[in-house]
């Protein structure tokens, strides 16, 4: 039956939860429960999650994003819950989350292709999407767009110290691990769930041809925020800074060094050692990058100030949220306790 409330369970590492909560707040027939890792997101991010009323509530879990994701995934396979409640997800484990995201890959790549001859005087360049990545849902949306015909030649997976996918691309060994806290906290994912989708869509050899991968530690993130501002005047957040630095390095010598035979140490921040099929287009200066920026820098004011020497301006809508009371609910990293809470609080 499709009668009754649809309960959305969503794990967030910082940004997904507030977007989902805002989209579904006060929507009749929908109920939203957001799980986020306590103490591992910025103050503004937490305020965006913990101040909802009505049909949206936030559980702050004593654990990591991977723990939050595990609780949500386990709930979806729990027969007791499935019999009593209509459950769905707004995470990328739900394909309905990925399909709309694929549209902006399609749109942006078509706009660039149609404008490039006017703006850059390049002749049919390769279009590369540079994607700050944690759980790899966003990048997987780009892969879907490419398979639907978007004129994208390749992707750069830009990650922080949680470099499970870059290490896989470098070695062929997929080794999920506990996540590590970084300045780019929305990407603090040690076991990306979309690895399974990527592996289902492409062979490992195809992945190495399609992807470059680039990672930074915290010091590199701060330097990149400052470098981006110095070179472009743009104030960028920690996640976008990794994407910006990845493209800046790739098109200014790093890819050319790989093509010429230099071996990269993938244990050090930077580019993984595989050479994608579009590498020569980089060397020949016949490639254009589309860098995805994922968050407002004001959500990471202390980090940006430390990097640039000044705080980013906080938009009024974020400043207003900071004045609202915290309504988050503490939750242990224990599935039985989480299940008990759901059974007691969800409405049929």
Residue ranges and their predicted role:
Residues 1-261, 270, 276-348:
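PLP-dependent amino-acid enzyme catalytic core
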